[in-house]
Amino acid sequence: MRLSMLLVCVVLLGVAQLRLSQASRLELSTAPNLPARVYLFKDNKPFRLGPVDSILPIKVDLFYRDTLWQAVANPKTLEVLAYDQSHVLLLDGAATFELPPGKYRVEATRGLFYEPTSESFELKAGETTKVALRMKRWTEPGQEWISGDDHIHLPRTEANNAVYLKWLQAEDLSVGNFLQLQRQMDAAPQYAVGAAGEAKATGYSIRSGQESRSEPYGHIVMLGGRALVRPLSVGTMYANEPAAYPFPSILFGLGKATGAMTGFAHFHGSMAHSTLPMDLALGNLDFLEVFQFGKLWTAEWYELLNAGFRVTGVAGSDFPVPLGRSLPYPKWLPLLGPERTLVKGKAGASAYDSWAAGVKRGEVVLSNGPVVELKIEGGVAKATGAFFRPMESLRIVRNGKVVATVKGDGTRRKLEAEVAVVPGESAWFAAHGLAKKEEGEPDIQAHTNPVYALVDGRPVRVREAREAYASRWAAEVEYYRGAKLPFANDRQRTEFFAACERALGVLRQ
């Protein structure tokens, strides 16, 4: 019996050694050495890299329970698996893989500011092949940007921080706002909030925040606060009992008391009805998500700017939701921060603090690829737009209307436009650039936040836009009065409708 067992072991060992002798080793790296996201193709078909040190299987559902699994203490690789598509991150810029012999191609991307790169090679049985991917930054020398995604849903423990920070580096995303929310129970929970929950590496931060949701009022976001504001959600759709209180204005006040930046998600909150006009009128908002899922809400954004509301437009992914919106996922787009909130400058000790300061100032560019900038000097508004692919157009917008357009010629990677600032009337200006897109990609574009040219400090106020907002809010108030909102008592109801009327009074001024 022992002899037969020994013979079996010898045979199995021989088979294993034969398999190892037939395998090929790939030593993959980037040059210069930078974390990056990579894709492998064998005979021009997607092929999984392996083995990997850590894996994040994504199942996009309503509860955000996606858990990071690590095989070793300090992973060099992370595989994100979603919708049968494999995305591998070189967390240290280099890793070794065991693969069958054959002809391969590997592609690498890193955020928005590096050109995609690829290398073709052949692996032979029993041999080691070294492949270096040349990473080239396309932005102008000396330009520094702090990039942020205001809307990521991933559960996070303190033990996850090292991998997730390197993931941010592989996507060249300076700031990831990880938002806790609620669906029955807490979803995408964070181990801590405020400074205690901030994970930092040089130039990068992960900061906890929250998304609070309600069916009658919409989805709102609070970033960077020292404490969670509860309840995270109200009403039976997201929580566990009928409720209409607290409404967003109350939550925003509580959030600001913790030092949080406050804003609406999905532009108007993603529900059929929204208190966005009320919260704009009452000055509760620092930002609005205006760029998400490849869509830039330009018409709606321009209208509220014309109505006199100075609020910063930001970009956020709502990760992991975008992974299923376009299949296969476009390799050019980062997984985290496919649309980004860019603040010009260099990150300080906390990348989040530097980024948040820029958002509060309104000095923000929104992009999923190009860089556009606009400045006003000498009575002229001047815009530039650049990308590593050809730029298709660059426009200057004044108070919601296009006042200058420059078209690309199919080859130019940088465009410039300018227009005179008409004296005597307050106005806001912005630049919007479009670049060439590949099959399966959304529009590749960038948009500045408004730059103001005010006369004697008078705000921009376009009568038609202001009246439209007032009318829209009046209609919403009538809806709410007839909706039988489940307030717990008359005090809550009175408080809500008093706020509604205050906002209506402001909008009608």
Please place each PLM-identified region on the residue numbering:
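Sequence-structural signature of the catalytic-core scaffold of metal-dependent phosphohydrolases
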Residues: 2-3, 28
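Serine/proline-rich low-complexity intrinsically disordered segments, especially terminal tails, linkers
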Residues: 6, 23-26, 343, 369
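A broad, low-specificity signal marking well-ordered, structured residues that form hydrophobic/aromatic
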Residues: 26, 148, 204, 220-221, ...
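Bacterial N-terminal signal peptides
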Residues: 4-15
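Long luminal/extracellular ectodomains of secretory-pathway precursor proteins
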Residues: 17-23, 29, 34-218, 223-228, ...
